[in-house]
Amino acid sequence: MAIRKYKPTTPGRRGSSVSDFAEITRDHPEKSLIRPLHGKGGRNAHGRITTRHKGGGHKRAYRVIDFRRHDKDGVDAKVAHIEYDPNRTANIALLHYLDGEKRYIIAPQGLKQGAIVESGANADIKPGNNLPLRNIPAGTLIHAVELRPGGGAKMARSAGASIQLLGKEGTYASLRMPSGEIRRVDVRCRATVGEVGNAEQANINWGKAGRMRWKGKRPTVRGVVMNPVDHPHGGGEGKTSGGRHPVSPWGKPEGRTRKPNKASDKLIVRRRRTGKNKR
């Protein structure tokens, strides 16, 4: 993937860029693998906003991605197409299995149209192949990793993401996450070899607010420019700094959003670096 920059013909075009979509080989999805997707606008079943800054955006269809490939062990598949997916930053690959079934997977870096991929304990160590962690050599970069055996891929699924397999000891494998965190995972968990493709997506300059609205993202208004009735940082004469440590609109201090008693935390060997320790 390469980034194509626009000429500054308008204020919105100045500095903006877009993917050249050179890797994409088809401009429409497989009909049997799409589902209707109804936007919720950040609302819950009661109609109340539970997630701010969501709403609008272009109409989309959901592409059904295969995050559990264990039922296709020993069945080779040919990469028929590399496609765009509006629901994620990564591209997706359409696989045609030898038994006639078609499925989507996240497209790893370097996977080309016409390549053959496989899954199972005896699969080769090459991009796109899916196998248990116990069968992957230490030092390999992987993505689409399960947290629990058979639970489906949960980690490292966005564009450019990868996890490094550091080593294996007993029934656990040590993984270095994209955040720098080191975590232990059951060696029976599956992963796909390689890094997620479309890494240059992070360098796209969206250029104008309207392009973010096309994506379904609404404006994020700072608390210090609100009135006191709307935010703890609001009000004051002229420009102010808020007068207190940063908080949410409901008065909760910013940061520390991780659940403190999550069951899987006992498998974290080293925490990610945050704040002052991020060096």
UniProtKB/Swiss-Prot annotation:
Keywords: Ribonucleoprotein, Ribosomal protein, RNA-binding, rRNA-binding. GO terms for biological process: cytoplasmic translation. Residues 37-58, 269-279 have a biased composition (Basic residues). InterPro entries: NA-bd_OB-fold, Rib_uL2_dom2, Ribosomal_uL2, Ribosomal_uL2_bac/org-type, Ribosomal_uL2_C, Ribosomal_uL2_CS, Ribosomal_uL2_dom3, Ribosomal_uL2_RNA-bd_dom. Residues 253-268 have a biased composition (Basic and acidic residues). Pfam families: Ribosomal_L2, Ribosomal_L2_C. GO terms for cellular component: large ribosomal subunit. Gene3D superfamilies: 2.30.30.30, Nucleic acid-binding proteins, Ribosomal protein L2, domain 3. The keyword Lipid metabolism does not apply. Belongs to the universal ribosomal protein uL2 family. One of the primary rRNA binding proteins. Required for association of the 30S and 50S subunits to form the 70S ribosome, for tRNA binding and peptide bond formation. It has been suggested to have peptidyltransferase activity; this is somewhat controversial. Makes several contacts with the 16S rRNA in the 70S ribosome. PANTHER family: LARGE RIBOSOMAL SUBUNIT PROTEIN UL2M, RIBOSOMAL PROTEIN L2. This is Large ribosomal subunit protein uL2.
